[in-house]
């Protein structure tokens, strides 16, 4: 996977920037204001992997021509047993470089311009090493410049020369010369670019065009191209039989016309080639087909769907192919720009649930978004917050399992302000999704619980009604967060109580240090605690502020032991 990327003079980014993307998770979000550079990151990977044109930052023309060059340098984290042995020596050099890199590694004093990417990279690697045992992984910071030559960004400095011990003529000003970088790392670079497949789905994509079977993106999702599919269905023997029959017909005409014959130019007569047959089949069979969605009245072409339905269809198609068709997605990285675009607020949560499931079937899923409601609900994921201050970009990477604690810590320590979006919008967007989805004609029902283990158990016991009752089970990270969500729902309830059709149930454990708060008697919103009765051996649901506060009870204390052991 890609855990981060160095960007220099690419689209929104001037100078050198390091953007951390993951500390081990395959579900990676990018948040920030419009125009701040979220989609630039996804575009850069399209240029790197797929050869799309580079969108060069205009500041490059003003920079020093002696050192300025645009580059894209992803930082890969790859299991050692997944990289061919012949690349291990080079990968070991780069892993040493990444792990040992510190403020002295560049070899020159850091300036206000060069310090931020260096510090961000160092802090990111420290965080990664806390989260992941890197014993079985290579960390490979390796990319290319505009001309396609291998590039190591700011990591090309004193530490690199110490590690690989180059000859004197390979070094200039304490750095490896471009020719030396190419000599040492170009072959590994080409392998990485070919090994991984990258699909970029921009916000303004035409869903009708994107979902056609002949597009490269759909074929990447399927894990095979149309030529391979046709070859499997129409083997060479059939094409040979067609040629034999057609040549027999031409020979018959030649006999009938005596001194005339239908021939191709030259002495060698051309037969129908395999590629000719494939192209005919693609044109006459596949190209005329469009994606249709089945509903109660029949089939509807994607062009006739609403904007929100089109956006949903793209994610549904990706998930369907990855889950049911492609053999595995180990080499596939997907970048999606604003997957919530055009969706009603009530549909955002389900869209991001689909995204999360999709991330489990590919190597990595990176997305940009303005909807923060997924932050409290995802246990295994990362989100990078991007802010700009005085034309300089700042990046903060959060692990979603504990992002609230990280925010509190950074708020106390950071010189820069933590963006309010992260602190407020994550909960507010989730509340809006819950309320709006309960107002629909076919409403959702919600079960809010403390953590991911509760969700795991509850999903098993309630599996029969998850689909039939449109039940969504959401872990929010502890009793305090359950309380916060209840109080926000309670405040909003009066405005919508006549129209609410769905139900919201908030469930907490009974902890030793009980978190008690008053709970109003609201018909469609209930807030309860689980508690065991040691006398009757029955688990009860009591109000949060009930006087029954012992024994302390967690969901594990209430499970059916036979089901649990199975």
What are these regions (language model features)?
Residues 1-56, 290-430, 435:
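Switch/communication elements of ASCE P-loop NTPase nucleotide-binding domains
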Residues 1-220, 458:
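P-loop NTPase switch/coupling surface
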Residues 49, 81, 207-208, 454, ...:
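Short acidic, S/G/P-rich loop/turn micro-motifs used as interaction or catalytic elements
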Residues 82-86, 151-152, 209-211, 374-377, ...:
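Switch/connector loops and helix/strand junctions flanking conserved nucleotide-binding motifs
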Residues 195-199, 203-333:
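Extended helical coiled-coil dimerization/tether regions that scaffold
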Residues 197-199, 332-334, 445-447, 471-472, ...:
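Hydrophobic beta-strand segments of well-ordered beta-sheets in folded domains
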Residues 373-505:
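RecA-like P-loop NTPase motor core
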Residues 507-566:
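Activity-critical C-terminal alpha-helical subdomain
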């Amino acid at each position: 996977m890609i855990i981060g990327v160095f960007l220099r003079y690419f689209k929104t980014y001037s100078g050198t920037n390091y953007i951390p993307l993951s500390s081990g998770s395959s579900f990676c979000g990018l948040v920030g204001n419009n125009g701040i550079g979220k989609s630039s990151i996804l575009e850069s990977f399209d240029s790197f992997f797929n050869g799309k044109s580079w969108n060069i930052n205009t500041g490059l023309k003003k920079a020093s021509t002696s050192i300025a060059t645009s580059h894209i340098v992803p930082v890969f984290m790859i299991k050692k047993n997944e990289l061919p042995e012949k690349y291990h020596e080079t990968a070991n050099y780069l892993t040493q470089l990444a792990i040992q890199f510190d403020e002295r590694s560049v070899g020159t004093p850091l300036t206000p311009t060069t310090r931020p990417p260096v510090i961000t990279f160092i802090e990111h690697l420290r965080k990664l090493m806390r989260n992941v045992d890197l014993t079985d992984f290579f960390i490979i910071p390796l990319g290319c410049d505009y001309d396609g030559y291998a590039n190591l960004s700011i990591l090309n400095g004193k530490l690199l020369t110490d590690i690989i011990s180059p000859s004197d003529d390979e070094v200039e000003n304490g750095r490896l010369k471009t020719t030396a970088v190419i000599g040492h790392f170009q072959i590994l670079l080409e392998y990485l670019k070919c090994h991984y497949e990258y699909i970029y789905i921009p916000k303004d994509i035409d869903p009708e065009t994107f979902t056609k079977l002949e597009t490269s993106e759909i074929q990447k999702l399927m894990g095979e191209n149309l030529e391979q599919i046709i070859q499997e269905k129409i083997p060479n023997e059939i094409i040979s039989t067609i040629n034999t029959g057609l040549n027999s017909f031409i020979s018959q005409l030649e006999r009938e016309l005596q001194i005339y014959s239908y021939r191709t130019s030259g002495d060698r007569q051309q037969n129908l080639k395999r590629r000719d047959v494939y192209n005919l089949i693609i044109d006459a069979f596949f190209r005329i087909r469009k994606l249709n969605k089945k509903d109660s009245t029949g089939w509807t072409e994607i062009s006739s769907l609403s904007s929100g339905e089109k956006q949903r269809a793209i994610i549904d198609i990706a998930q369907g192919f990855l889950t049911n068709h492609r053999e595995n997605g180990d080499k596939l990285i997907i970048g999606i720009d604003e997957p919530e675009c055009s969706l009603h607020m009530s549909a955002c949560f389900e869209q991001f649930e689909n995204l999360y499931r999709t991330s489990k079937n590919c190597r990595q899923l990176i997305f940009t978004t303005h909807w923060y409601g997924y932050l409290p609900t995802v246990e295994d994921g990362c989100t990078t917050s991007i802010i700009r201050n005085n034309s300089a970009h700042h990046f903060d990477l959060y692990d979603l399992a504990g992002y609230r604690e990280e925010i509190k810590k950074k708020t106390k320590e950071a010189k820069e302000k933590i963006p309010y979006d992260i602190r407020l919008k994550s909960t507010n967007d989730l509340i809006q999704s819950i309320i709006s989805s309960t107002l629909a004609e076919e409403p959702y029902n919600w079960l809010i619980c403390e953590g991911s283990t509760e969700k795991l158990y509850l999903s098993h016991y309630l599996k029969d009604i998850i689909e039939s009752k449109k039940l969504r089970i959401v872990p929010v990270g502890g009793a305090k967060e359950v309380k916060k969500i209840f109080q926000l729902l309670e405040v909003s309830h009066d405005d919508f109580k006549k129209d609410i059709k769905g139900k919201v149930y908030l469930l907490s454990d009974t902890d030793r240090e009980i978190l008690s708060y008053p709970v109003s008697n609201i018909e469609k919103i209930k807030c309860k605690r689980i508690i065991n009765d040691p006398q009757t051996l029955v688990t009860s649901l009591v109000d949060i502020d009930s006087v029954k506060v012992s024994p302390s009870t967690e969901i594990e204390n209430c499970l059916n032991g036979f089901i649990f052991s199975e």
